[in-house]
Amino acid sequence: RDRLRSRGLGDVYKRQAFIKIEDGCDRFCSYCIIPTARGSVRSRSLQDITEEVRFQVSCGHKEMVLVGINLSCYGQEIGLRLADAIEAVCSVDGVERVRLSSLEPELLTDEDIARMAAQKKLCPHFHLSLQSGSSATLKRMNRHYTPDEYYDIVLRLRKAFPDCAITTDTVSYTHLRAHETGAYLV
């Protein structure tokens, strides 16, 4: 931290707080051990989340980053949606910005997107896990979407957030699959 401060970057740790709102996963992708290792989705209550956010604001944090193993699944077992958590965090006095960690694209509904778009404190950056541009590979991976469905969610996000940033991650097992994904992304 001293080296960061000497370069004028020391306050970076004061600006952001990472708020874990969800743990576990029920998706069972073929390559992933998380459902076995971490168990089913468990979401924190909105009251618990907002209490932590208020504490972080009192410590000087102005930007909250909502994180989870499968953030898009937030609330599924307690009758809530990710949009509920976003609205709750955005409503806390002193919060200037809210960011989201990686999202599963197929779990975002039009209602979720509309509710998110109404939150002016939400940064319009969405990291959507693509994994592969190949339908066959996605099916073998037990991902629950196709490249066309992924593209559709990108279009819906861009309609609601015209200047949004979309980032992704991919996995390439073979040269052929890497080529398919590269061609899809271009």
Predicted feature residues:
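Single conserved hydrophobic/aromatic residue that forms the stacking wall/gate
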Residues: 2-13, 175, 180-186
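Pocket-edge positions in alpha/beta enzyme catalytic cores
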Residues: 4, 40-41, 77, 142
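Glycine-centered loop/turn positions within well-structured domains
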Residues: 10, 27, 39, 72, ...
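Canonical Radical SAM [4Fe-4S] cluster-binding loop centered on the CxxxCxxC motif
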Residues: 15-47
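Conserved alpha-helical substructure of the radical SAM core
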Residues: 36-65
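Active-site glycine- and acidic-residue-rich loops that bind
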Residues: 42-47, 106-110, 176-177
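Conserved SAM/AdoMet-binding glycine-rich loop
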Residues: 58-173
